[in-house]
Amino acid sequence: GACGYLSCHDYAVHIIEEGADPGKCRVIDEETREKIFKAVGVEGETVYPRLPLVYCAAEWEHKETSAEYKGVQTCRAADLVAGGGMKCEYGCLGLSDCTIVCPFDALHMEKGLPRVDVEKCTGCGKCAEACPRDIIEMQDKKYEKLFYVACSSYDNIMRVREICGVGCIACGVCEKLSQGKLFKVTDNLAKADYSKQKSQKDFANIQPKCPTKVIKDI
């Protein structure tokens, strides 16, 4: 699991017998966590749920191709064969490698993109490990909503509009509105900086101003 141990029992044994950190479980609520801390006689820090962010917003209708891929139907195989025929070399290939490895049935493909069931996700990170293009990243959810730029492309605006249409165009609106604190555009791609966030409104107020609506939330 996300705690780094084989099972809940294995984790519990390490806590009791080896003094392992009792605050690594991300699927229990705060009340249960406090009970565990009290039972083992330690104080712990708040542990936030960890969710996978999919840095791509292109559904099947947005994915421009240069050739039809007929090889082995896995993302890893397709990525090795001319990127599966996709013109965007950064986007989701949509062949379900991430959903297949999820042990909690928390990820499902919908219109060519993996969708996360936040109620089932335990933050184990197996989906991120399975993605050959590294477009899935695990991130702590400290507020009701977690905002992110759903794009991984470093292509310029002309290329993005040509082969996708829903990606980041590096317009800089998010960076300007946040005065460079919450968003930063580097190499044609905007990225969020959660270390500067103080409230949910910080990102929520900027999200609707994005011209391509590529700032998503989960």
Question: Locations of the language-model features?
Answer:
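Ferredoxin-type iron-sulfur electron-transfer modules and their immediate structural context
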Residues: G1-L177, S199, A204-I218
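Short, loop-centered acidic/histidine patches that primarily coordinate divalent metals
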Residues: Q179, S195
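Short, solvent-exposed loop/linker segments at beta-strand-coil boundaries, enriched for Pro/Gly
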Residues: L182-F183
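Polybasic, proline/glycine-rich intrinsically disordered low-complexity segments
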Residues: D187, Q197-Q200
